[in-house]
């Protein structure tokens, strides 16, 4: 009984532990409630908390802690629960235990801490948490090892890095090897290199450990890195090498070391700094001398042209300057800005350097590019001593810059009084003038330097000196508003009433700028208010114009005349009203401003307000007595103007103030006539409601209906007819409205008038009917309409000439401009706005000018009566010129004209493309000037706030994710980028985009795609249709064409309430779509009505959008391609493809025509000729057709085939008797069917070189503009242009020439090119004149395929061309354009390709073609080919007349520079990079494009926008003075304001070399294991439970896995190599990388592995690359001798031999450190590179017959001391014996190797290898065994590679039993026939 009770208790305890281990909380609590001891444990001392912690059961751990289990209970091995959780990596459990008070530094029996365990197992998060909660990483085990030691030994790079970095002040977070390099810690570095032999691991900023060592001057670690193969010339993206850094830091020994190890002395950074630049900039004389002695280029230039002597002068390093001069540095060397070292010294104020330079012969008067001398610069920077020195040594005090500035001008402008005094005392003239005749007093006045001005005046400076435009210093001061300066000048007798050439006094200028204090000061000195400008503007006019209310008040208080009339009779009130300055209007009216004052043409202010729709201003004027019926000289009232402009609110206001709506002008024009002229229906409605006469006539008898019919305003015609306008009213010439409409060609209006009772038989006074007029003028459509209804008997024969009839109009011009800007341009200082632009351009056209009146363009030779229209010119508001380029907008036409003929007049050429415009609540629209049809319409009350609307075009290749296109889809337009992106509008806006898609066979449709982010594209949907257009326009006067008109013009209209990032139009096959739900449904094709898809119930589980696409297959296309071999049904597609349905859906497809005509049901499956083809490929991939007839049952009914399918796909029926060919036929036909059709035009350019020879250039273009082509710049002439022709994407176009022109080509050669949409498709064709006595003309035909005489071709386009006259001097140009001599001289360009041309001829031809097609891109190509700015400028200067010349010169220069390295592939790559891949495609075919397409790394999205043109006038003096050395160029130079040597300034911020107390933890405190020992590894606790009948299988598996892993040998580099490698992205600044590396904030490093190919193959260190060199691998890594076929190995072997021999040579680094190095390091140095722990030798790459070399290397290796890792209890004697035995085994292996390998087999069969390896037995002891490895096979993996790799089959066995090894070999050979194996780790 006691036994059973005890058994039950033990079983309960075990069950409790099992529950804790499995996380069964309820069961565990039940056991505790039943009395189980919570602290019970298993046989190994593990209690419930231990077990739950190991398995990570957080809730169980928390509950046990709350139940007061003993937290610090230890197992038999001394482990606490925290130890176990840390070892298992259970970070949540670790957090709970630590938060509950667990001891983070508790040690187990052997001294293991939780941190040690976590570091051993690579649990980074646990390591971080423990460190943050007080874990001490310096607590060591009994063997003396720390967590860092075990992490290093295990190769856990992230843990190592964190442990090393933890505790640093700067949170630098560098790779571990970099930290070791920074601390000069050679031991840690050695271990890190043992785990990862790559010494050139990169930090985030791209620097290697050697860079760090060079920066901190750590010689020991630098030597180690170099010995281990670090690249001494490793160059990150910014170009900074270790030698740059060492030169900058000034460490002589480091520089010597790097130079001796092969550092390149001429290497340059990204900014082209050499090490000598760095040394000179920092004044390191000794290093500069060393570099110069080693041949450093003393004249090397940076990007900006700075040489080392410039650098030394900038840093005030006198000794460096002397040294450089001693080595013959050019004392007057110049930068790109022509700055000499003396300029630099003057800029920086370095008196001593300047004196040395002058003493050594520097020119004191050397001029920079903008003319500045050192004296100018010293005066500008206020360096008095340098200035005095320069003057003493011969500097000219009167030297002038390019703009005529003397040093006194500069000092006066900068306000340096001591300099000014000194210059005047030395004889400088106070009244000297620059090119704008400005004196120093002008300069001082402009900058507001009162003291300088006072001193100048005391020295007889002329106070009223006049500049070029007669402005005085007082004008300058008034403009800027320096009141004290104004008062000073006035006190010194400055005349306040002197005027400029345009008549402006200082008072005018101060009033314009709004400087009240200045105005007051001038008035107090009796400045006249009556002075007028040449336009008659008083100061009050100017204040009114610019809205300066306080100035206007002040002027009126000082008795300014409020009604002063200017040159055109304009009063200040006119001006204020015109500029909509309501506050000024309200100020003038109560103070006597008259609202009745007329201008010269009779316009009152109310006229202007009415015209500009200024309702509030108009109300104020009417309130103060303004007359609503005031008439101008021609009788125009404000109502006329408001009506004409369409301002309905203004019209209503005027009519409410007794305006007479029936009042006509002198010609009888009423407001309704003008409304009819412009088509404003809402205004007409207001007028009619106020009783205006509908049929009022003018003096010539025109009614409003006549006018509306004449101008094509169909909406207004309808409105007038609805209000009973007389449809047959006649003018005095007998013209009815129908006559007018017929005369102008308005077919729609003719039809409308006829429907409303217009008589077609009415004749004019000269007997002309409307039909006669239409026939005479050639209006075909109008004639067709009228001839049906016109009585033939009434037709009267008229004379050949038809006299045009035009309604009256008014031409009044009011010029409210004021010519005040011209002389003020020179006043521009910083922060001046665009009001300085010449304001004569500010003319406002109140209505369209004469040449803008809508007329028929088909009658150019018919004399026309002058149309009457109201033309009023007024000054427009200035913001337009500021916001956008005026040329980029086109005024909207009031009506879209319907014309049957094509205008022979080309559209006006506009230089800009619309970029942006401002829009507010009033709305607005803009049109593209370069892209006809592009329009953005923002209706009124759409924008909640003023918004800048932008529109740009984007190339698809510039997008990260272009729109996804299936093979039958294509972009029909450019991609439109609208802004602001994401803008939301209050109501819909309209975007119209021109497209170039053709409807093809009528089976295509246009779809609008939109993208919010540039990566996801979706179809644009809008709930607003065309019926909402009038509602959307919201009363806006903007004409929108019908859908038919848009389709005719190929314009797509988008209605949207927001702006995505991109819009684009796509052309695709028509689809019919619907939303299908679980209830089922069907889809029918509208294009092919018999096609139907039926969806049964539950085919889909939720409502989804499905589409059905049916593409007809034209029989003629099938016959053309396949003859009568097969016929096909329409192609039917269910979209989206590859969708699986829950129930089969039914499809119905019409049968092919041949099957329908002759059905044959005799067979099924493979025997029937009717084949069902299917392609399930989805997305943008190409269709792959397969025959599924055998697996799909077809049911025939009503000439259709029915079948079911579970998957949406493409389906196609084919009647093909040759069933095996059905798929091939379908593929061929489908390729033709999916080509996207476009509308393109052919344009031909021609040029004659001499009377018999010429050149043709043929374009097939979509939206490309002729004015941007190369031919425009090469003096070609356009000789022909086609109408729009339908062409297919990718179509081959063949040109055939006939007539008197003969193409210069071989007989069998035909000119052809491929069409690609939105690309420049160009064909160059040299021609000769057949018969010089006849006209040089002919016919050019474009065909679908090459011309054959026996077949008839369908000609796409046929153009007649006539060559232009012979261009003079073209022969010389022809000679220049031939780049053949250089191509012939360099054989590398002779690419031998099959064909009639030799390789040289082909290269020659390609170069010529590239030259011809480069055009304006040659400069971009030059930059891509790394040509300097000087080279590009030289090419421009030497070849000024022709782009072709410049292109040829560039390519010739490139060939000369590259020599034998010149390669067409490099040229093609450069062309692809600058987005000129079409040239490559033209030369090599389209296949190249896909192969060579690379991500563009430089270009941003290009659009066709032009930046606003720069303002005219002189450049700002402020700009010139603030950067005299750069001349407005952004290039860096030492003279930029406060810019301190851009290229290396960042390095100045790097702290000095670290002392012992660096930010890092003391490495002496972090013990790294001593030689011969390794850190002990922790094994997991045994969590098995005794008496347990059902162990948890997962726990058992885990235990087995862990113990199995630990029973293997210790993990070497194979299991976790320390790849401390990061992204090699580098800062763009030359030296930002290093400072970021050393001082950046904490950042996460990338875990990305560096590909082997990125390692530096040219490094000379052994152990770097195991594939190419004799590799020496440390640690536990097994080695074996391997031989490869690499051709480079012999060289590597020799280098390795040399390095082995150089270890004891005199020149090694040992000699540098014999006195300084510590004993341990000295010992390692003498042992050589093979001394690190158990190194084995792997020899590879020996050439055939190289046995002597192999022996030499092997012997040299064996001569060095070998060490190994002994067991802990081994004695020194044991180690010695083992070492001797190992050397014997190596010698034995060498002998065996030499005996076995003979002849050619030497390279392929390595011998046996004997190595010692260590294993851990079950008790945890280390056991050493000797292993023989024998290579039994070698397998060549890649015979194609230059450096072949081999994979070896290795069999291994213990040395004690070699017979077992032989058995293993035999066994292995039986099974290795088809498999390869690599050695197990």
Swiss-Prot record:
Q: Does the keyword Signal apply?
A: no
Phosphoserine-modified residues are where?
429, 759, 781, 817, 834, 856, 1082, 1390, 1392, 1396, 1428, 1486, 1523, 1533, 1617, 1666, 1671, 1686, 1690, 1696
Phosphotyrosine modification sites? 1073
Sorted alphabetically, which InterPro entries does this protein's record hold? Ankyrin_rpt, Ankyrin_rpt-contain_sf, Ankyrin_UPA, DEATH-like_dom_sf, Death_dom, Multifunctional_ANK_Repeat, ZU5_dom
Q: Is Nucleus one of the keywords UniProt gives this record?
A: no
Q: Which CDD domains match?
A: Death_ank1
ANK repeat ranges per the UniProt record: 44-73, 77-106, 110-139, 143-172, 174-201, 205-234, 238-267, 271-300, 304-333, 337-366, 370-399, 403-432, 436-465, 469-498, 502-531, 535-564, 568-597, 601-630, 634-663, 667-696, 700-729, 733-762, 766-795
Q: What is this protein called?
A: Ankyrin-1
Protein's organism: Homo sapiens
């Amino acid at each position: 009984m006691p036994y059973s009770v005890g058994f039950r208790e033990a079983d309960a305890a075990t069950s409790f532990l099992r529950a804790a281990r499995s996380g069964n909380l309820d069961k565990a609590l039940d056991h505790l409630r039943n009395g189980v001891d919570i602290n019970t444990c298993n046989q190994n001392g593990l209690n419930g908390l231990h077990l739950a912690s190991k398995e990570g059961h957080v809730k169980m751990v928390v509950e046990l802690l709350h139940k007061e289990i003993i937290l610090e209970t230890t197992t038999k091995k001394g482990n606490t629960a925290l130890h176990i959780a840390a070892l298992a990596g259970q970070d949540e459990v670790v957090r709970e235990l630590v938060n509950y008070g667990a001891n983070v530094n508790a040690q187990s029996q052997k001294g293991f801490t939780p941190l040690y365990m976590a570091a051993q197992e690579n649990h980074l998060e646990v390591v971080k948490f423990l460190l943050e909660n007080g874990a001490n990483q310096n607590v060591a085990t009994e063997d003396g090892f720390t967590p860092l030691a075990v992490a290093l030994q295990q190769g856990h790079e992230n843990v190592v890095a964190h442990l090393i970095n933890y505790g640093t002040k700067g949170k630098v977070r560098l790779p571990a090897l970099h930290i070791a390099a920074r601390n000069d810690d050679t031991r840690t570095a050695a271990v890190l290199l043992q785990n990862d032999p790559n010494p050139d691991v990169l930090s985030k900023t791209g620097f290697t450990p050697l860079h760090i060592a060079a920066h901190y001057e750590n010689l020991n670690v630098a030597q180690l890195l170099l010995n281990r193969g670090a690249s001494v010339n490793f160059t990150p993206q910014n170009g900074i090498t270790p030698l740059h850094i060492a030169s900058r830091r000034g460490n002589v020994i480091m520089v010597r070391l790097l130079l001796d190890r092969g550092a390149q002395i001429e290497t340059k950074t990204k900014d082209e700094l050499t090490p000598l630049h760095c040394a000179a900039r920092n004044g390191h004389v000794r290093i500069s001398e060393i570099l110069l002695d080693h041949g450093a280029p003393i004249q090397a230039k940076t990007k900006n042209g700075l040489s080392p002597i410039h650098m030394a002068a900038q840093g005030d390093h006198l000794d460096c300057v002397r040294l450089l001069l001693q080595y013959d540095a050019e004392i007057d060397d110049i930068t790109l800005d022509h700055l000499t070292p003396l300029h630099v010294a003057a800029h920086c104020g370095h008196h001593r350097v300047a004196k040395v330079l002058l003493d050594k012969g520097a020119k004191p008067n050397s001029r920079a590019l903008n003319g500045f001398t050192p004296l100018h610069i010293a005066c500008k920077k206020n360096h008095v001593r340098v200035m005095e020195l320069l003057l003493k040594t011969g500097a000219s005090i009167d030297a002038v810059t390019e703009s005529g500035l003397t040093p006194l001008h500069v000092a006066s402008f900068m306000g340096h009084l001591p300099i000014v005094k000194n210059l005047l005392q030395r004889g400088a003239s106070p009244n000297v003038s620059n090119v704008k005749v400005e004196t120093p007093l002008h300069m001082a006045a402009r900058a507001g330097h009162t003291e300088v001005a006072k001193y100048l005046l005391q020295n007889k400076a002329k106070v009223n000196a006049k500049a070029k435009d007669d402005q005085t210093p007082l004008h300058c001061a008034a403009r800027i508003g320096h009141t004290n300066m104004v008062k000073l000048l006035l006190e010194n007798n400055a005349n306040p009433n002197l005027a400029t050439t345009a008549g402006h006094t200082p008072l005018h200028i101060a009033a314009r700028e709004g400087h009240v204090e200045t105005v007051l000061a001038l008035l107090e000195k009796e400045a006249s208010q009556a002075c007028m400008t040449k336009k008659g503007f008083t100061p009050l006019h100017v204040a009114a114009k610019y809205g300066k209310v306080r100035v206007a008040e002040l002027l009126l208080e000082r008795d300014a005349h409020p009604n002063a009339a200017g040159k055109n009779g304009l009063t200040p009130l006119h001006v204020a009203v015109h500029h909509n300055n309501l506050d000024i209007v309200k100020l003038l009216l109560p103070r006597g401003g008259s609202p009745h004052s007329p201008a010269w043409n009779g316009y009152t202010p109310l006229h202007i307000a009415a015209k500009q729709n200024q309702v509030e201003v108009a109300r104020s004027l009417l309130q103060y007595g303004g007359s609503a019926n005031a008439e101008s000289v021609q009788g125009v009232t404000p109502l006329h103007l408001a009506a004409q402009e369409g301002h309905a609110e203004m019209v209503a206001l005027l009519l409410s103030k007794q305006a007479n709506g029936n009042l006509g002008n002198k010609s009888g024009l009423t407001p309704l006539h003008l409304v009819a002229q412009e088509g404003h229906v809402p205004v007409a409605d207001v007028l009619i409601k106020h009783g205006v006469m509908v049929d009022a006539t003018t003096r010539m008898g025109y009614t409003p209906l006549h006018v509306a019919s004449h101008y094509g305003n169909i909406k207004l015609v309808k409105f007038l007819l609805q209000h009973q306008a007389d449809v047959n009213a006649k003018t005095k010439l007998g013209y009815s409205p129908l006559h007018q409409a017929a005369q102008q060609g308005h077919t729609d209006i003719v039809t409308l008038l006829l429907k409303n009772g217009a008589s077609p038989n009415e004749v004019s006074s000269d007997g002309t009917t409307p039909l006669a007029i239409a026939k005479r003028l050639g209006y075909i459509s109008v004639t067709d309409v009228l001839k049906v209804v016109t009585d033939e008997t009434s037709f009267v024969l008229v004379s050949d000439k038809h006299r045009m009839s035009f309604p009256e109009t008014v031409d009044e011009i009011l010029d409210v401009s004021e010519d005040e800007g011209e002389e003020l341009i020179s006043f521009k200082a910083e922060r001046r706005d665009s009001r300085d632009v010449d304001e004569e351009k500010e003319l406002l056209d109140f209505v369209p000018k004469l040449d803008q009146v809508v007329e028929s363009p088909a009658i150019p030779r018919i004399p026309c009566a002058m149309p009457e229209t109201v033309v009023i010119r007024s000054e427009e508001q200035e913001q337009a010129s500021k916001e956008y380029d005026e040329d980029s907008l086109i005024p909207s036409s009031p009506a879209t004209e319907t014309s049957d003929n094509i205008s022979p007049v080309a559209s006006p050429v506009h230089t800009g493309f619309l970029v942006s415009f401002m829009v507010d609540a009033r709305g607005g629209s803009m049109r593209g000037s370069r892209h006809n049809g592009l329009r953005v319409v923002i209706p009124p009350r759409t924008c909640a706030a003023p918004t800048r609307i932008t529109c740009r075009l984007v190339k698809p290749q510039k997008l990260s994710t272009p729109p996804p296109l299936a093979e039958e889809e294509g972009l029909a337009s450019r991609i439109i980028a609208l802004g602001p992106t994401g803008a939301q509008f209050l109501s819909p806006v309209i975007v119209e985009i021109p497209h170039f898609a053709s409807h093809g066979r009528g089976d295509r449709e246009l779809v609008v795609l939109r993208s919010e982010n540039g990566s996801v594209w979706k179809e644009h949907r809008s709930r607003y249709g065309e019926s909402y257009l009038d509602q959307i326009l919201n009363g806006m006067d903007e004409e929108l064409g019908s859908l038919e008109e848009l389709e005719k013009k190929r314009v797509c209209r988008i209605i949207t309430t927001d702006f995505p990032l991109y819009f684009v139009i796509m052309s695709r096959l028509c689809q019919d779509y619907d939303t299908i739900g679980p209830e089922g449904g069907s889809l029918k094709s509208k294009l092919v009505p018999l096609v139907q898809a039926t969806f049964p119930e539950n085919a889909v589980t939720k409502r989804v959008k499905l589409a059905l696409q049916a593409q007809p297959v034209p029989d003629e296309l099938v016959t053309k391609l396949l003859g009568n071999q097969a016929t096909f049904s329409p192609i039917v597609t269910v979209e989206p493809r590859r969708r699986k349905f829950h129930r089969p859906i039914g499809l119905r497809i019409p049968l092919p025509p041949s099957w329908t005509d002759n059905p044959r049901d005799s067979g099924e499956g493979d025997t029937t000729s009717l084949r069902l083809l299917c392609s399930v490929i989805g997305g943008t991939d190409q269709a792959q057709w397969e025959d599924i007839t055998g697996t799909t049952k077809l049911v025939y009914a009503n000439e259709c085939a029915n079948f079911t399918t579970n998957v949406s796909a493409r389906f196609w029926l084919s009647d093909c008797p040759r069933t095996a060919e059905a798929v091939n036929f379908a593929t061929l036909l489908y390729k033709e069917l999916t080509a996207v059709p476009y509308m393109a035009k052919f344009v031909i350019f021609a040029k004659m070189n001499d009377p018999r020879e010429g050149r043709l250039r043929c374009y097939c273009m979509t939206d490309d503009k002729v004015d941007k082509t190369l031919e425009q710049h090469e003096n070609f002439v356009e000789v022909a242009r086609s109408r729009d022709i339908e062409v297919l994407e990718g179509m081959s176009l063949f040109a055939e020439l006939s007539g008197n022109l003969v193409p210069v080509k071989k007989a069998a050669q035909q000119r052809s090119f491929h069409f690609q949409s939105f690309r420049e498709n160009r064909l160059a064709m040299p021609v000769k004149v057949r018969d010089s006595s006849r006209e040089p003309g002919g016919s050019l035909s474009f065909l679908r395929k090459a011309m054959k005489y026996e077949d008839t071709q369908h000609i796409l386009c046929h153009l007649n061309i006539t060559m232009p006259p012979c261009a003079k001097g073209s022969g010389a140009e022809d000679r220049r354009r031939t780049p053949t001599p250089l191509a012939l001289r360099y054989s590398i360009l002779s690419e031998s390709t099959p064909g009639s041309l030799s390789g040289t001829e082909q290269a020659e031809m390609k170069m010529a073609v590239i030259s011809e097609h480069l055009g304006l891109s040659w400069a971009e190509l030059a930059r891509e080919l790394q040509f300097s700015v000087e080279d590009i400028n030289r090419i421009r200067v030497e070849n000024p007349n022709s782009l072709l010349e410049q292109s040829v010169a560039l390519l010739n220069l490139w060939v000369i520079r590259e020599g034998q390295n010149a390669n067409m592939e490099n040229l093609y790559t450069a062309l692809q990079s600058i987005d000129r891949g079409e040239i490559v495609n033209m030369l090599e075919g389209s296949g190249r494009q896909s192969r060579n397409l690379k991500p563009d790394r430089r270009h941003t999205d290009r659009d066709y926008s032009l930046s606003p043109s720069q303002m005219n006038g002189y450049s700002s003096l402020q700009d010139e003075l603030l950067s005299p050395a750069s001349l407005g160029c952004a290039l860096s130079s030492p003279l930029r304001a406060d810019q301190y040597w851009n290229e290396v300034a960042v390095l100045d911020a790097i702290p000095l070399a670290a002392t012992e107390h660096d930010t890092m933890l003391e490495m002496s405190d972090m013990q790294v294991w001593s030689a011969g020992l390794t850190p002990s590894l922790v094994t997991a606790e045994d969590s098995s439970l005794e008496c347990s009948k059902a162990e948890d299988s997962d726990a058992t598996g885990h235990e087995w896995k862990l113990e199995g892993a630990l029973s293997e040998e210790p993990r070497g580099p194979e299991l976790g190599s320390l790849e401390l490698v990061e992204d090699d992205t580098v800062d763009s600044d030359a030296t930002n990388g290093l400072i970021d590396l050393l001082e950046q904030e904490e950042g996460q490093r990338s875990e990305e592995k560096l590909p082997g190919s990125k390692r530096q193959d040219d490094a000379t260190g052994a152990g770097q690359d195991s594939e190419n060199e004799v590799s020496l691998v440390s640690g536990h890594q097994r080695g074996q001798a391997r031989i490869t076929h690499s051709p480079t190995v012999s060289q590597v072997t020799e280098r390795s031999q040399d390095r082995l021999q150089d270890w004891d040579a005199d020149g090694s680094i040992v000699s540098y450190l014999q006195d300084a190095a510590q004993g341990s390091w000295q010992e390692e140095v003498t042992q050589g590179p093979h001394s690190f722990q158990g190194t084995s030798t792997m020899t590879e790459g020996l050439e055939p017959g190289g046995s002597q070399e192999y022996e030499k290397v092997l012997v040299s290796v064996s001569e060095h001391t070998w060490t190994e890792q002994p067991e802990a209890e081994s004695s020194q004697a044991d180690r010695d014996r083992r070492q001797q035995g190992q050397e014997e085994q190596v010698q034995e292996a060498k002998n065996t190797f030499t005996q076995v390998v003979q002849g050619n087999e030497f390279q392929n069969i390595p011998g046996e290898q004997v190595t010692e390896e260590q294993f851990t037995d079950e008790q945890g002891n280390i056991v050493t065994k000797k292993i023989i490895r024998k290579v039994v096979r070698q397998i060549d993996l890649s015979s194609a590679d230059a450096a072949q790799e081999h994979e070896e089959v290795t069999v291994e066995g213990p040395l004690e039993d070699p017979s077992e090894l032989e058995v293993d070999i035999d066994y292995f050979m039986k099974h290795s026939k088809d498999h390869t194996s690599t050695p197990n780790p």
